[in-house]
A protein has these predicted regions:
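Bacterial N-terminal signal peptides
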Residues: 6-15
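N-terminal, active-site-proximal structural segment of metallo-dependent hydrolase catalytic domains
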Residues: 17-90, 99-106, 122, 173, ...
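Metal-dependent phosphoester-hydrolase catalytic domains
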Residues: 24-29, 121, 180-187, 194-287
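Active-site-proximal beta-strand elements of phosphoester/diester hydrolases
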Residues: 41-51, 119-123, 141-143, 152-162
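Solvent-exposed loop/turn segments at secondary-structure junctions
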Residues: 49-53, 77-81, 100-104, 113-116, ...
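Extracytoplasmic, non-cytosolic globular domains
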Residues: 59-62, 138-215, 219
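Structured beta-strand-rich core segments of catalytic domains in phosphoester-bond hydrolases
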Residues: 77-152
Length: 287
């Protein structure tokens, strides 16, 4: 549920993160408090920037052009580009950088003039559920507090396993159970590699697991638009058209914030080349 000193936006990364000039408490779960409604919009942009297939200077320019967002959740970030991408967002942004994932790390950046950082974690596991087998990305989250309203929330970002279907399924189960155990609202956003097909309206086994027991709901985009370009055979055509890898998930009570998601399409974003990302960003706004 939404809480005055707590509603959560979920971005996943929990094993120790780097925060800029901020002391971070190691708290497993947010504190439960009385509910309150905040009328001010919170806007989030999530984007897999394709760590090994982009020109970092081009990505930084594109990030700089995204104005008006409070929180950025990036996937596939090389460690040497953390500072570059943070600087591109503006002086008021503070970043939490994931330590897992080798060259494909996670990064969450937020407007530090609006929000105070209370907690951050990368999750290797939750209860008995594995979220990282040691060679992948751990879910990353931050717990923030609005400096004006006092409202607290969690933002979690993810990049689930691509080539290991069984691990991806276990990650989805672990995230679902993590969401079940939270006592504040949660938004989980990022690249989930769940292979949702527009024609069949189905995803893979991880897609099925994350929705089991109705813990998470999908903030479906207002228009279904392909979020990933994959030309594995080099013929200039997308091998998986009309599909999605990138999602925004919210718990049932988060619907009270009227979440609106859309896929951001820019001129020339697809087909992908060596300077740009092979993913389109997604945007989530909560009223």
């Amino acid at each position: 549920m939404w809480k005055l000193v707590g509603w959560s936006l979920a971005l996943l990364v929990l094993v120790g993160c780097e925060a800029t000039a901020t002391s971070v408490p190691d708290v497993e779960q947010p504190t439960s408090v009385d509910p309150i409604t905040d009328s001010k919009t919170i806007s989030i942009l999530a984007w897999n920037v394709e760590s090994d297939g982009n020109d970092p200077s081009v990505i930084a320019e594109q990030l700089n052009a995204f104005n008006g967002y409070d929180i950025f959740c990036l996937q596939e970030v090389r460690a040497e580009n953390f500072d570059r991408y943070t600087a591109a967002l503006g002086r008021q942004f503070q970043s939490i950088n994931g330590r897992t994932g080798r060259s494909d790390r996670l990064q969450i950046s937020f407007d530090s003039e609006r929000f105070e950082l209370l907690e951050t974690k990368e999750l290797m596991e939750h209860r008995d559920f594995i979220l990282n087998n040691g060679t992948h990305r751990s879910p990353l989250y931050v717990r923030l507090q609005d400096r004006v309203t006092g409202i607290q929330f969690i933002v979690m970002t993810n990049h689930l396993a691509r080539g290991n279907a069984e691990l991806r399924k276990q990650q989805a189960i672990g995230l679902r159970e993590w969401g079940r155990d939270q006592n504040v609202g949660v938004i989980n956003i990022g690249d989930f590699n769940m292979d949702y097909d527009f024609a069949t309206e189905r995803g893979n086994s991880a897609f099925l697991e994350i929705f089991r027991d109705n813990i998470f709901s999908w903030a479906k985009p207002v228009e279904f638009i392909d979020t990933n370009w994959a030309d594995r055979d080099g013929d200039g055509k997308d091998n998986y058209p009309d599909s999605m890898l990138d999602f925004a998930f919210v718990p049932g009570p988060a619907k009270d914030r009227n979440p609106v998601c859309r896929v951001i399409v820019r001129d020339g974003d697809f087909s992908d080349d060596d300077s740009t990302s092979d993913h389109r960003p997604i945007e989530l706004k909560l009223q």
